[in-house]
Amino acid sequence: MTLNLLIAPDFAPERFAGWHMLNTLLQKRSGLQLHLLTPASAAEQAQLIAEGKVDAVYANPFDAASMIRDAGYQAIARPMGKSDEMVIATAAGSAAGSAASTVEDLQPGCKIALTDNKDVKLIGLRLLEPADLTEADIQWQMVDTHQAAARMAIKGEVDASFFLAEAYHSLSKLTKSQLKALMESKLADITHVLLTSAKVGADAERVKEALVGLTGTPDGQPVLDELGIAGGFEPMTQEDAEFMIDLMDTLLD
């Protein structure tokens, strides 16, 4: 039986090779047949999951919370020292004219670009609290990629853009030189999570052991470094998952 492993579409394109390397290594170490799925958008991810085609998924924390609660997935591992943070950025310099200098400069009716990543939006709204802005106060501009969000900010088509911090920091030097980060979150306890469906059954333990065992090994560590997860992965318990879900609920309140 082949298991489909889906990687959330939250990461920079440069990471794709690393995910394929990881998939190959997990197959070798677990003895399981794994087929990698790399959807281009959140909508494509949702469709694949709804069609029952996803056996394991490296999901962002917001999606992970709903999949654990509503779809019977279980959390088995998470990256160590690799929390999901987000950045609010706007155009740098005077080229953008009235570009915001601080979060407080953003006013009701402002335009903000972002990809369809619910936890980035959720955390971003919390960071906007000093500006006294709610979700309804903002004109949201949905884009497919972080690069598109960056372009809109640089061109002054939006007042700011939301980014997954890893995606922001992986933008080219030229792009980042034209952006100014207004704020970056420091939550620490919210991470992407590897989930498995009930269909995987006892094989979930084999996947977890293969993943957790990569750290510091001659073949595993270079792959982790390629993915920007140098600390590797650690097992995640049901209690750990419930704690993170409670934290997400707090952000929603």
Residue ranges and their predicted role:
Residues 4-27, 85-150, 166:
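Bilobed "Venus flytrap"/periplasmic-binding protein-like clamshell domains
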Residues 1-53, 59-62, 219-253:
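N-terminal hydrophobic or amphipathic helices and topogenic motifs
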Residues 36-47, 136-151, 188-189:
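Short helix-initiation/N-cap motifs at beta->coil->alpha
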Residues 1-8, 81-88, 174-211, 229-247:
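Periplasmic-binding protein-like
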Residues 47-105:
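Acidic, polar ligand-binding/catalytic clefts
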